[in-house]
Curated annotation (Swiss-Prot):
Keywords: ATP-binding, Kinase, Magnesium, Metal-binding, Nucleotide-binding, Thiamine biosynthesis, Transferase. It catalyses: 5-(2-hydroxyethyl)-4-methylthiazole + ATP = 4-methyl-5-(2-phosphooxyethyl)-thiazole + ADP + H(+). The keyword Transmembrane helix does not apply. Pathway: Cofactor biosynthesis; thiamine diphosphate biosynthesis; 4-methyl-5-(2-phosphoethyl)-thiazole from 5-(2-hydroxyethyl)-4-methylthiazole: step 1/1. GO terms for biological process: thiamine biosynthetic process; thiamine diphosphate biosynthetic process. The keyword Endoplasmic reticulum does not apply. Its EC number is 2.7.1.50. GO terms for molecular function: ATP binding; hydroxyethylthiazole kinase activity; magnesium ion binding. Substrate binds at M50, G199. ATP binds at R126, T172. Belongs to the Thz kinase family. The lineage of its organism: Bacteria, Pseudomonadati, Verrucomicrobiota, Verrucomicrobiia, Verrucomicrobiales. Catalyzes the phosphorylation of the hydroxyl group of 4-methyl-5-beta-hydroxyethylthiazole (THZ). This is Hydroxyethylthiazole kinase.
């Protein structure tokens, strides 16, 4: 288990690598969050590519993509087939990919698709408590895409899911938990206003893909995601305490985020 000092150093290293290498993140994501997702990736220093077609996704993966995001937020049967194709190609090319199983457990099409995708070697699975519990095979209660359980409630399911899939699992909530099934890191950065803006959670999936493109391990990428987004959320609220302006300030805060901010603000919870 890394010390808090080691964790902070790893997060700042990931931030620096993203800005130095500008990884291309191919996002097969939902239509509601595409603008925020693309702008968030640009703000942190990555390069977004937003596609839905299977043939074009394969072409993009072969052109030097750093990571792939698969987000099920507004999935259709056609898009689901494209996701399957993209995942197979990413695995063939050894490109890390992230599964964001939005509203899994609440709706049948995406629940079936997520069950298939989780068996195809995602590097990171990012979800709220209800989504992670459902994907792990536990009963959960959702309110649309929102969780009615706490992230701590899903920790056991997250560890089981990580061991089963080989992925790092990032459970987001008031406390964010990152686990590979053996190690667990809990981070307490963030602000409640983040839950009042559509797409922030989904954009964390995109950020985790950017981190996965540069980080030495999926678990470290998950931790970096939680810390960087959480700190940016805190900084954004200090500037803009209302939802509309907060969304803009979140992008500004990610753009301005410095290693010193990480050192000063990162908060890890002892388990």
């Amino acid at each position: 288990m890394l010390s808090s000092t080691d964790l902070v150093q790893a997060v700042t290293a990931d931030l620096g690598k993203i800005r130095e290498t500008a990884p291309l993140v191919l996002s097969l994501t939902n239509s509601v969050v595409q603008p925020l997702t693309a702008n968030l990736l640009l703000a942190i220093g990555a390069v977004p590519a937003m596609l839905n077609d299977a043939e074009e996704a394969v072409d993009m993966l072969r052109s030097g993509t750093g990571a792939l995001l698969v987000n099920l937020g507004t999935v259709t049967r056609e898009q689901g087939a494209a996701m399957q194709t993209a995942v197979r190609e990413a695995n063939r090319l050894n490109i890390p990919w992230v599964l964001d199983p939005v509203a899994v457990g609440a709706l049948s099409l995406r629940t079936r698709l997520a069950g298939q995708l989780k068996e195809q070697s995602p590097r990171i699975i990012r979800g709220n408590a209800s989504e992670i519990m459902a994907l792990a095979g536990y009963s959960s209660v959702t309110k649309g895409p929102e969780s009615t359980s706490s992230s701590a409630d899903a920790l056991h399911a997250a560890r089981e899911l990580a061991l089963h899939t080989g992925a790092a699992v990032l459970v987001t909530g008031r406390t964010d938990y990152s686990t590979d099934g053996r190690q667990v890191t809990a981070t307490e950065n963030g602000h409640a206003m983040m839950s009042r803006v559509t797409g922030v959670g989904c954009s964390m999936g995109a950020l985790s893909a950017a981190c996965a493109a540069v980080s030495p391990t999926p678990l470290q990428a998950a931790v970096s995601t939680a810390v960087l987004m959480g700190i940016a959320g805190e900084m954004a609220f200090e500037q803009s305490p209302s939802p509309g302006s907060f969304a803009v300030s979140l992008l500004d805060s990610l753009y301005a985020l410095s290693p010193e901010d990480v050192v000063r603000r990162a908060r890890f919870l002892s388990l």
